[in-house]
Amino acid sequence: MRYLLLSSCLFILASCSSVYKNLQPATGDINYIQKFKPNFNNALYKAEIDVVGHHLSGLLLIKTLPDSTVRMVFSNEMGFKFFDFEFKQNGDFNALYVVKQMDKKPVIKTLKKDFELILLLRKDTQTSYLRKDGNSLYYIFPKQKGSFCYITDLGGSEMKTMEISSPHKPIVQAIMKNYTDGIPDTIGITHTNFNFTIGLKKIER
């Protein structure tokens, strides 16, 4: 079914909603979160993306190049390309190609941040900090407005969810589940303030 992949991802995200109030200071190594950084050497996903009133489905190829640049190419199954992004090791980002319907600065900026979240990029450990509640550890990386937050169980063995927050509330929630050889089988991203969702399911090759 057309929305089956997105619906399953959003169900998981809805069950992982984070509450920032009542968090307590926690001790630990902020870099420990890097154990969950996906190893996208060459991964292919079935993708469904709802963005700016368009439903797009196809294949998303995520590949790490020899210089550690991560390349993301989203196309339909006939080979028509929707976008081609690259994320440099030094933090630079390039939109090498974007189809006309998506070639809008807010859309590209949003996709950039969403993918930076799941790639575990933009991590300034000088300003980052740990918090906890009764069930979870929160690895918080402040940015200009809000923060990137990675939430694990208290033992740090499972990534529960990832969030981009405004100063007041989460505005993006994401999950990565069922890792094999460092590659997640399922990835879901949803925005809480408007209709912008991404659902990915790994294709075995």
Where do the language-model regions lie?
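Extended lipid/amphipathic-ligand handling interfaces
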Residues: 60-62, 85, 174-179
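Post-signal-peptide N-terminal segment of Sec-exported extracytoplasmic proteins
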Residues: 36-71
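Amphipathic hydrophobic-ligand
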Residues: 54-56, 77-83, 168-171, 194-197
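Positively charged n-region of N-terminal signal peptides that target proteins for export
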Residues: 1-4
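An acidic-aromatic
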Residues: 71-119
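C-terminal motif of bacterial Sec signal peptides marking the signal peptidase cleavage site
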Residues: 12-15
